[in-house]
Amino acid sequence: LDEQKGALRWGNLMATLGWRQQVDSVRYGQANLFVTRYHMRASALSRNSYGEPNTSTYQASVSESVQSNNLLDVGLRGSLEHRWAAHRWQGGFSWTLHRYCLEATLSQSSNLSANLENPTQRSFSNQQLWTHEGVLYGEGDFRLSPTVRMSGGVRLALFLVEQKGYVGIEPRWAMMWQPFPGVHVQASYARQHQYSHLLSESYINLPTDTWVPSTARLRPMRSDQGTLSIGYEGVHGCHFSMEGYYKQMRNLLAYKDDFHVIGSFANWEEKLTVGKGQAYGVEWLARKEARRWSASLGYTLSWSDRQFAEIDNGRRFPSRYDNRHKVNLTFSQKLSQKVELTAAWTYSSGNHLTLSVENYEPANPVIPSRWQMDGYGRLDSWLPNTYEESLNAYGRRNNYQLPPYHRLDIGLTFYRPMTKGRMGIWQVGLYNAYCRMNPLFVIKDERRANCYPLVNTPGQSDVYRPVFKQVGIV
C-alpha cells in the first residue's frame, strides 16, 4: 500500500515608502524605502506498507518532510535625473540588507515492523545568512546627430557576505541609427552580476526552487549580452521589429548529479557545482495600435544550454528552459472610458527534465534506502527497507522534453477616477480560460512516461481544475 500527499504554499509581500521632489525645471529627484518578503513552504507525506499485518514479513513506514525558503529584503534607494535639450543624465544609489533562510527542513519518520516497536526519528535544519549589497550608478542618453542616438552608463556594485566582499563593474552601452524615417537599427552590450542564485531541483512550473546568495566559496554569476535589432514604425499605428541576441553566463550554480546522496542536512554548498552557459536566438514582434484597441504578436526562436565539469561528464546539455519556440498574442479593447477588456495567449515548447533510460533489478535484494520522487518532482528518501526494487540508469542531463505549454488569460479592468488626480483600478479575470491541461509532473512505468496536469486523481472528493479566478486592486 502506497499513499503520497503534498502541499505547496508561496507568496510575496512588499511595502514601499517614497518621496519625490521637482528640484527645478530640469532636475528631478526621488528616494524610496522598501521591504520585501518571499516565502515558500512545501510539505510531503508518504505512507508505505508491505506484507501481511501481524506477520514476520510486514513492514510499514510513515515519512513526513517540510521544506521552506524565505528571503527578506530591507533597503533604501534614490536617484537624481537631469535633462537639457535632447539629452538626459541620471545617477543614483541603493543599499539592501538581505536575509536568506536557505534550507529550513523538518523531517520526521516512523517505522512499524514485526521486530521493531514503532521507532521515530526527527531531524531539523535551519540555515540563515545575512548579506549587504550597495550600488552606485550613472547613465546618460545623448543625441549625437539628427539620426544617431547613444546611451551608456556604468554600475558599481559591492556585495558583502561572510566577511568577504565582491566588487562588480557593469558597463552598459547602446547606439541607435535611423537611416530612413520610421526605420531604426540598434546595437547594445551589457554586463551584469547577480548575487542571488535560483536553484532548481525539480522540473515543474511551480515555485519550488530555492533562492541562495553568493558566498565566500561561491562567486556571483556574471553575464555578458549583446543584441542587434532593426525596427519599423509604420503608418496607422503599425510597428515591426526583429532582434537577435547572444548571452554568455559564468559562475552558474546547479545541483550535482549525486547531490541527494550527500544528505538532506548537509551544508547546502556541498551539493552544488559551478559551471557556465549560453543563450541565443531571434525575436520578432508585430504591434498594431488604434484609438480604442491594440494587438501584438511576438515569436521567439531560441537556444539555451549549460556546461558543468561535474555534470554529464562535462558535456553541454540543454537547460531546463531551452524552449525552442515561443509565441505571445495579446489584445486589448476599450469598451468605455472606464472599462477595458484584455486577452493574452501564450505558447511555448515544453521544459526539459531528466528521466532514466534503463532500469535494472539489484543483485542484492537488500536495498539500504529507497530513493523516490516526492510530490514536487524532487528526489527524496525514506527509511531503510528489505524489499527488491529496480535501479534507475540515467543518460544525458535533461534528456526528456515535456509537451508544449499554452493557455489563454482573459481580464476586465475598471478605472475609477478619485480625488486629487488619483485613479482607482479594479481587475478581474480568468487564468487559463479554456482549461488547457498543461503537464505538471511525469510518472514513469515499465512501458512509458505519462504526463499529468494539475488535477486530483479520480475518486477524490475535490477536483481542482487549472482555471483560476483573479481579482486585483491597484
Stretches found by the model and what they are:
Residues 21, 72, 78-84, 141-144, ...:
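Residue-level signature of outer-membrane beta-barrel architecture
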Residues 9-13, 70-74, 130-134, 165-169, ...:
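Residues that define the transmembrane beta-barrel architecture of outer-membrane proteins
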Residues 177, 181-226, 246-269, 344-359, ...:
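Surface-exposed extracellular loop regions of Gram-negative outer-membrane beta-barrel proteins
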Residues 338, 347-388, 402-474:
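C-terminal beta-signal and adjacent terminal beta-strands/loops
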Residues 31-37, 91-97, 152-158, 187-191, ...:
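Transmembrane beta-barrel strands of outer-membrane/channel proteins
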Residues 9-164, 238-241, 289, 296:
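Face-selective signature of the C-terminal outer-membrane beta-barrel domain
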Residues 24-26, 84-87, 145-149, 178-182, ...:
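Outer-membrane beta-barrel channels and translocator barrels
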Residues 246-248, 266-357:
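Gram-negative outer-membrane beta-barrel transporters
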